[in-house]
Amino acid sequence: MFEQENWQPSASIENLLARAKIIAEIRRFFTDRGLLEVETPVLSEFGVTDVHLSTFNTTFISPTAEKSKALWLSTSPEYHMKRLLAAGSGPIFQLCHVFRNEEAGQRHNPEFTMLEWYRPHFDMYRLINEVDDLLQQILDCKPTESLSYQFVFQEYVGLDPLSAEKAELVAKAKQYHLQQAEQEDRDTLLQFLFSTVVEPNIGKENPVAVYHFPATQAALAQISSEDHRVAERFEFYYKGLELANGFHELTDVNEQLHRFEQDNVQRQKMGLPQRQIDKRLLGALQAGVPNCSGIALGVDRLLMIALGANAIHEVMAFGIENA
């Protein structure tokens, strides 16, 4: 009766065995360095304000409550982990499932495994070095090359991303077939050109860390004290994949509140629903999250490189198509 059902795993048993071995090796990497492994909730009262993230939500119906409660599936354990940092956890890491209500395909699955860790008293460069250590251990690859966002953008796009006029960015985006480019804001143009022109050209032979993204793309990173045009944010690229996104973390509660509010302003302009601001994170920041750097790394993409897989479902027991 059920012979035609697609019941078999997405990944081969061989790949699942290799996956388990690599995840165990990742855990050893961090425990050997004295980091505490933590677990935080998958469900939360608060979603995220970031306009670039689409979230899943559900409803908690309690027989003892007067009304149901909306809950959000985690897109990242970041906010909860920062609350632990404020409580005095020290350096921490986590391997967990996260959820993003976005595309599914060769490089994306709505549910995937995230490795996230935080290092009190590390600056951005020291954390880049630790990511490099991890990649060399897991992938046996060449050392990471660190390049500034400004440098790689000028190298491949031919414009200075920090000073180019919007008209120049529009003209360049049109060369790469962005429809109605003149209607997009400056950051959207930068992001389009970076993903379309820069990303395919970096990280082919060795991992590349791109640092000092424009301040307008700071997300939850600090603005550089040496150059206010850039943020202390970095990303890792290797073998055609964006692997990780890291920050010298923003710890100023007032600035964080302002950024959340600006996210909701942008959401309104884009016709997106506004999101409730996570007051518990703000409470932790006010209490004192230590100066730290943190990073989120896509484990499934790391496994794709390690195992030579062409699609993300080849390293997952079950991808979204047969979950």
Curated annotation (Swiss-Prot):
Reactions catalysed: D-beta-lysine + L-lysyl-[protein] + ATP = N(6)-((3R)-3,6-diaminohexanoyl)-L-lysyl-[protein] + AMP + diphosphate + H(+)
Name the record gives this protein: Elongation factor P--(R)-beta-lysine ligase
Function, in words: With EpmB is involved in the beta-lysylation step of the post-translational modification of translation elongation factor P (EF-P). Catalyzes the ATP-dependent activation of (R)-beta-lysine produced by EpmB, forming a lysyl-adenylate, from which the beta-lysyl moiety is then transferred to the epsilon-amino group of a conserved specific lysine residue in EF-P.
GO cellular component, one term: cytosol
Keywords: ATP-binding, Ligase, Nucleotide-binding
GO BP annotations, alphabetical order: lysyl-tRNA aminoacylation
Binding-site list for substrate: S76, P77, E78, Y118, E249
Quaternary structure note: Homodimer.
An MF annotation (GO) of this entry: acid-ammonia (or amide) ligase activity
EC number: 6.3.2.-
Chain positions recorded as ATP binding sites: R100, N101, E102, N109, E242, L243, G298
Native source species: Pasteurella multocida (strain Pm70)
Keyword ATP-binding set for record: yes
Xref: Gene3D superfamilies: Bira Bifunctional Protein, Domain 2 (3.30.930.10)
